[in-house]
């Protein structure tokens, strides 16, 4: 049941009650337990996360960072709604112009980010990811930070199989 409690609470939106009783130990069946079914949203750039870029990324999945958070290349900033990992630019700022209009600059409303606890972060990790724990924060990142090097390593791993 390790890793299932978070998924259960998400499915029931916090209203579920879960009880369990130990029955017996059984041998592990490969592929039966764990694993994340969705990919990660990975930052492509280093800098501060902006509200402008978070608004466009929200459509693609769940965000883990607040606006203004320092991010770096290879850092996992959210969970993709699909199975593959998606590299996104969360540091992109809005272009400023001299032309202003009343309807153009609307108030930006974004969803509250999902802040992962230590246990949730451990559940989220895949084989190619690391977790950094500091007194201030818990960050998830890819083992290989550079996007191009990650792609080369994935091709090499695929050809070796």
What are these regions (language model features)?
Residues 1-161:
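Accessory interaction regions appended to the cores of large information-processing enzymes
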